[in-house]
């Protein structure tokens, strides 16, 4: 199964989602802030990135822009994850370079469907 990079600063959310994805057969790498997410994506490009948008040090918007700006990582699909479903956030995510968007709390079947669609593309 593919390797997923989960960029999430909330320990509970990170642990819960990573365990659920691992049970589905994915290998999950974890970063706790946007800068670490960018560094990990560049060092060992994953098949897909799940990016929280509200992160310390560097937010998910900027981390996504940097990953998509680099020729080594621009092909990696990124799904934006946000707890604050504000009007315009989905558009903002797409403008930053995200390939899809999901809101918290995460519904695993919905997220898996989005992941599988992007991984097949």
Predicted regions: what is each one?
Residues 8:
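Conserved acidic carboxylate
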Residues 44-50, 55:
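Active-site beta3 strand of CheY-like receiver
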Residues 15-23:
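Charged docking surfaces used in two-component/phosphorelay signaling
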Residues 106-115:
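C-terminal output helix
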Residues 25-32, 40:
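Short hydrophobic/Thr-rich beta-strand motif most characteristic of the beta2 strand and flanking loop
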Residues 56, 74, 86:
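The feature encodes the CheY-like receiver
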